[in-house]
Amino acid sequence: MGAMFFGLMLFTLGWTLIDGSESEQDFMWHVRKIPRLVSERTFHLTSPAFEADAKMVLNRVCGIECQKDLPAPSLSDLEDSLSYETVFENGSRTLTRVKVQGWVPEPTQNLTSQGAPVRRKRQVYGTDSRFSILDKKFLTNFPFNTAVKLSTGCSGILISPNHVLTAAHCVHDGNGYIKGSKKLRVGLLKMRNKGGGKRRRGSRRNRREVSGAGREGSQDSLKETAKAGRRRKGSARRQRAADGRPSFQWTRVKNTHIPKGWARGESRDPALDYDYALLELKRPHKKKYMELGVSPTIKKLPGGMIHFSGFDQDRADQLVYRFCSVSDESNDLLYQYCDAESGSTGSGVYLRLKEPDKKRWKRKIIAIYSGHQWVDVHGVQKDYNVAVRITPLKYAQICLWMHGDDANCTQG
């Protein structure tokens, strides 16, 4: 299975690079100047209730045609949407207002496909082309090791030793923070030790209890009980490994950042363009992570293909990888027919391109998978699995969240 999957990966990469209409320049990361986001003022807000229900599907999302008819957002509108809420581990919450400097408006992207009849709601299109990553050689190595699972049921991706990028709706429904996000945890993939791992040393209290029990009962009965317990635990671990289900190391989230473009409250519906959030981990990890990149246009995608991995709920905690071509785009969204189920939302969408002036290739995150949505295209409803593009402004915002200033956010 592992060899076949590796061969398929090589074939896919080669297939995306053989189109004679594409030049070598099209397969490079183009360094772009990033506008500055400056924190202007921070306000303390009331602590959230964490009572909202998770909302995975938004009805009648403003699609490409709809966005094309809207006036271009003003600088004030952008600054309002890019201002952000931060929720801390102790339940406190703040709102930070930002100023944008050096922003150059981008031209509106053209529609890349023609109108189509209304489609039946679905998240897997035709033959299911997803691949479960079962081989440990792939599962715990880059790029698959960058995928993480959220305790709220979504996926995410490691973008630094301390940060995870995910979809905003995984923690906030646009009006309030969802149930389960108060004590949010992130599960990182880890290797299973042979034989189920090392046995932890018991606490001093547990050792005292065992000592007391030993005085009341025979040492032989205690040994038999301990052996039986270890056999049961070892059997459960081996069964999970045989099923291809990964093991997780769970880490608490220290704070969460969400743009105001999503967390609009009761006054307006959340904007799908801002369905992304950054989670700061309480403890850093030592795994290889994936860097951010600015999303290129469809014409600059090798073969028009994107890739992402997540924990689809219909595959029992297996890590699922998929790749597909992008159908349409707007300035902020990518519309595609990648096969995916709930649980994979929040996954990092990435590309593998060549670095400028270097011979090596590098993967970078260019979008966040938002899930299955209905969008208005040419006056009809079309269903797409949608990803939120990382634009220069969003790159600057996420970088500001990570570093606290714009010192490392000038180019992307």
From Swiss-Prot:
Keywords: Disulfide bond, Glycoprotein, Secreted, Serine protease homolog, Signal. Residues 217-227 have a biased composition (Basic and acidic residues). Transmembrane segments: none annotated. Gene3D superfamilies: Trypsin-like serine proteases. InterPro entries: Glutamyl_endopeptidase (IPR050966), Peptidase_S1_PA (IPR009003), Peptidase_S1_PA_chymotrypsin (IPR043504), Trypsin_dom (IPR001254), TRYPSIN_HIS (IPR018114). Residues 192-207, 228-239 have a biased composition (Basic residues). PROSITE patterns: TRYPSIN_HIS. It holds the Pfam family Trypsin. GO terms for cellular component: extracellular region. Residues 192-246 are annotated as: Disordered. Glycans are attached at N110. It is found in: Secreted. The keyword Disulfide bond applies. Its main location: secreted. It comes from the Eukaryota. Residues 124-407 form the Peptidase S1 domain. Residues 1-23 form the signal peptide. Disulfide bonds join C154-C170. Belongs to the peptidase S1 family. This is Inactive serine protease 35.
